[in-house]
C-alpha cells in the first residue's frame, strides 16, 4: 500500500505539472506569464509600472514583497503590453525614451530581457535590479559574503558597511566585464543567475566593473548594471542593451552559453541579427607574453573585446557595422591602437603589434600590466575597504633589491601614507640623466604623483581628468591609467644610496582614505 506521504508528494508534483500551461493571463492590472518549464516558473508584471511583482518558481515565491524588480529604481509609469507568438511571449514596457522587454521561451525557466534607450535615464545609470527573497536565496556568488551588508553599520556614505568586524559593500561583488558572464544568488534548494553575453551598448570597456549583487537583509538584490557613473571612463551609449537573461534553477549552475538568436524574429527595437554583423580576425604580437593579451574595439555606438589565443590570434565577437578604434593590451595596459572598419556579413583581417618601450632599466617595481598586481593590499582591495583590519599597513619604505613586491603599497593616500619612499643603490654608470616613469591606474579627488629624487623635486603634474566617483574604497582600481614621466637631470642620481619619495598632491583634501589618492601600476627608473 502506498504511504500517505508518497501520495501527498505525488499530488503536489501532479499539481505542479497539471497547472503548467505556456501562456499569458491578463489579471486586469497585471500580466502573469507561465513559462511551462519542467520546474514551473511564473512571474507577474504590473501593467502600469512594468515592475515584476511576483516570481513563483517551483512553488516558492521569490519576489520581495516590499518592492518590485525593475529597471533603475522603477519606471514609475509605462505602457505595458504582452503578446504570444508560437513558443515565445514578449512583454513590452514603453516610455518616451526607454523600452524594456521580458521574453520567455516555452519550456525554459528563464526570463530573457533587453532594454532599448534613446537617452540616458535621469538618474544617471542604467541597471536592472531583481529584488529576491533573502530567506530562500541568502547567498551571493561567486565572491560570497563580501557584499552581504545585512546587519551592518555604515562607515562610508550609504554603501560601505561594517559587519561583524569586516567591511562589506555591494561594490565588492564586482567583476571585470570581460570575465563577468554569470553571477548568481542562491540558497539550499534554488539558484538564480544573471547571464550576460552582450555588453555592446554598455560603457567602460573590458576592464570596467560594477555592482552584481547585494544581500541587504530585506531582500537579496541581483543586478545587471548596463552603465553607471561608478568610475566611468567613457560616455554612455544608447540603443539596445542585451539580451541578458535571468535563469532559475534548483541545482547546479547554468551554462553561460544561451542562444538568444530568436530575438531577431520578435520585433525588438535595435536588435541586430547575426546576418547584419561582421567580425575582425587577426594576430596580435609584441607584448609581454607572460600576460594575457586583450583586443578591444569601440566607437560611439558599441564596444567589443576578446582575449587572444596563446599565439596572439583572435576573432572578434559578431560586431555591428562601423569604424572602430582597435586597442591592444598586455594585461590592462594599452600597447597599440589602430582603426578598423567592419561590414555586415563579412570578416575583416587586421593585425596589431605593440610593446612597452622604456630604456635601460635601473629598477622597476611592478609590471606594466595596467593593474596594481602584487603590490601591498592589492590582493584584498577588490573585496574590502582599505580601512579593514585585515589589510596590511599602508606605510612602508621599499628598498630595491631586498624588499618584496608586496612591501610597496598599491596606493598612496594624501592623509594616510604620504609619501611613499623608495631606496636604491646606483653605480657610477647610472648617474647620468634618467627618466622616472610612474604608472597609475586610478586617481581620486585630483590626486597625482610628484616625485623627489634625492634633492631634486620634479615638476607638479597638472590635475588628471576628474571621474567624479569614489574608487579604491569601493573596490575599483581601474580609471584612465595616467602615466607620468619625470625627467631626472644628470648628477641627481649619485653613486651609492639614493632616495625617491612619491607624494600625492592635490588642491583638494579629505579624511583618511577619502583624501586625494592614486593607485599604482608600475614605477620604472631608466636611462
Swiss-Prot record:
One Pfam family matching this protein: fn3_3
Disulfide feature:
50-93, 184-193
Enumerate the InterPro entries for this protein. Carb-bd-like_fold, Gal_mutarotase_sf_dom, Galactose-bd-like_sf, GH-type_carb-bd, RG-lyase_II, RG-lyase_III, Rhamnogalacturonase_B, RhgB_N
A GO MF label: carbohydrate binding
Q: CDD domains recorded for this chain?
A: RGL4_C, RGL4_M, RGL4_N
**Glycoprotein as UniProt keyword:** yes
EC number(s): the record gives 4.2.2.23
Keyword Chaperone in annotation:
no
Q: Name one GO cellular component term.
A: extracellular region
Instruction: Tell me, in one coarse class, where this protein mainly resides.
Output: secreted
User: Which residues does UniProt assign to the signal peptide?
Assistant: 1-20
SUPFAM superfamilies the record matches: Galactose mutarotase-like, Galactose-binding domain-like, Starch-binding domain-like
Keyword annotations: Carbohydrate metabolism, Cell wall biogenesis/degradation, Disulfide bond, Glycoprotein, Lyase, Polysaccharide degradation, Secreted, Signal
* Catalysed transformations (reactions): Endotype eliminative cleavage of L-alpha-rhamnopyranosyl-(1->4)-alpha-D-galactopyranosyluronic acid bonds of rhamnogalacturonan I domains in ramified hairy regions of pectin leaving L-rhamnopyranose at the reducing end and 4-deoxy-4,5-unsaturated D-galactopyranosyluronic acid at the non-reducing end
BP term (GO), one? cell wall organization
Q: Which residues are glycosylated?
A: 27, 46, 351
Class of the enzyme per the UniProt entry, highest EC level: lyase
Q: Where in the cell is it found?
A: Secreted
The UniProt similarity line reads: Belongs to the polysaccharide lyase 4 family.
Q: What does this protein do?
A: Pectinolytic enzymes consist of four classes of enzymes: pectin lyase, polygalacturonase, pectin methylesterase and rhamnogalacturonase. Degrades the rhamnogalacturonan I (RG-I) backbone of pectin. Active against linseed rhamnogalacturonan.
**PANTHER family xrefs:** RHAMNOGALACTURONATE LYASE-RELATED
Q: What is this protein called?
A: Rhamnogalacturonate lyase A
Q: Which gene encodes it?
A: rglA
Amino acid at each position: 500500500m502506498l504511504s500517505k506521504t508518497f501520495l501527498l508528494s505525488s499530488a503536489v508534483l501532479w499539481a505542479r505539472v497539471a497547472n503548467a500551461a505556456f501562456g499569458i493571463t491578463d489579471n486586469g492590472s497585471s500580466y502573469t506569464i507561465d513559462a511551462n518549464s519542467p520546474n514551473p516558473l511564473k512571474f507577474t508584471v504590473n501593467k502600469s509600472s512594468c515592475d515584476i511583482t511576483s516570481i513563483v518558481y517551483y512553488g516558492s515565491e521569490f519576489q520581495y514583497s516590499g518592492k518590485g524588480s525593475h529597471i533603475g529604481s522603477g519606471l514609475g509609469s509605462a505602457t505595458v503590453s504582452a503578446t504570444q507568438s508560437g513558443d515565445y511571449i514578449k512583454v513590452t514596457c514603453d516610455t518616451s525614451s526607454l523600452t524594456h522587454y521580458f521574453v520567455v521561451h516555452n519550456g525554459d525557466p528563464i526570463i530573457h530581457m533587453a532594454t532599448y534607450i534613446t537617452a540616458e535615464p535621469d538618474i544617471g545609470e542604467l541597471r536592472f535590479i531583481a529584488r529576491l527573497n533573502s530567506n530562500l536565496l541568502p547567498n551571493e556568488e561567486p565572491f560570497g559574503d563580501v557584499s552581504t551588508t545585512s546587519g551592518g553599520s555604515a562607515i562610508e556614505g550609504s554603501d560601505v558597511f561594517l559587519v561583524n568586524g569586516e567591511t562589506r559593500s555591494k561594490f565588492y561583488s564586482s567583476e571585470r566585464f570581460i570575465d563577468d558572464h554569470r553571477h548568481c544568488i542562491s540558497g539550499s534548494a534554488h539558484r538564480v543567475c544573471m547571464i550576460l553575453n552582450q555588453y555592446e551598448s554598455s560603457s567602460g570597456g573590458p576592464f570596467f566593473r560594477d555592482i552584481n549583487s547585494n544581500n541587504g537583509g530585506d531582500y537579496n538584490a541581483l543586478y545587471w548594471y548596463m552603465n553607471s557613473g561608478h568610475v566611468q571612463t567613457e560616455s554612455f551609449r544608447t540603443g539596445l542593451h542585451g539580451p541578458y537573461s535571468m535563469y532559475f534553477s534548483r541545482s547546479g549552475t547554468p551554462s553561460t552559453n544561451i542562444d538568444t538568436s530568436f530575438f531577431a524574429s520578435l520585433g525588438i527595437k535595435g536588435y541586430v541579427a547575426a546576418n547584419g554583423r561582421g567580425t575582425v580576425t587577426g594576430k596580435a604580437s609584441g607584448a609581454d607574453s607572460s600576460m594575457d593579451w586583450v583586443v578591444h574595439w569601440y566607437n560611439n555606438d558599441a564596444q567589443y573585446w576578446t582575449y587572444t589565443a596563446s599565439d596572439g590570434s583572435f576573432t572578434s565577437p559578431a560586431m555591428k557595422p562601423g569604424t572602430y578604434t582597435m586597442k591592444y593590451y598586455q594585461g590592462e595596459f594599452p600597447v597599440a591602437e589602430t582603426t578598423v572598419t567592419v561590414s555586415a556579413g563579412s570578416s575583416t583581417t587586421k593585425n596589431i603589434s605593440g610593446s612597452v618601450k622604456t630604456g635601460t632599466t635601473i629598477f622597476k617595481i611592478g609590471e606594466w600590466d595596467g593593474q596594481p598586481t602584487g603590490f601591498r593590499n592589492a590582493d584584498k582591495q577588490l573585496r574590502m575597504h582599505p580601512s579593514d583590519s585585515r589589510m596590511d599597513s599602508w606605510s612602508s619604505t621599499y628598498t630595491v633589491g631586498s624588499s618584496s613586491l608586496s612591501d610597496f603599497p598599491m596606493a598612496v593616500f594624501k592623509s594616510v601614507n604620504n609619501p611613499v619612499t623608495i631606496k636604491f643603490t646606483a653605480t657610477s654608470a647610472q648617474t647620468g640623466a634618467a627618466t622616472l616613469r610612474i604608472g597609475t591606474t586610478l586617481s581620486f579627488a585630483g590626486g597625482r604623483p610628484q616625485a623627489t629624487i634625492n634633492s631634486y623635486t620634479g615638476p607638479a603634474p597638472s590635475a588628471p581628468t576628474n571621474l567624479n566617483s569614489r574608487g579604491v574604497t569601493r573596490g575599483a582600481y581601474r580609471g584612465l591609467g595616467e602615466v607620468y614621466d619625470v625627467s631626472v637631470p644628470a648628477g641627481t642620481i649619485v653613486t651609492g644610496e639614493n632616495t625617491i619619495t612619491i607624494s600625492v598632491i592635490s588642491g583638494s583634501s579629505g579624511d583618511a582614505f577619502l583624501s586625494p589618492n592614486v593607485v599604482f601600476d608600475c614605477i620604472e627608473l631608466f636611462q
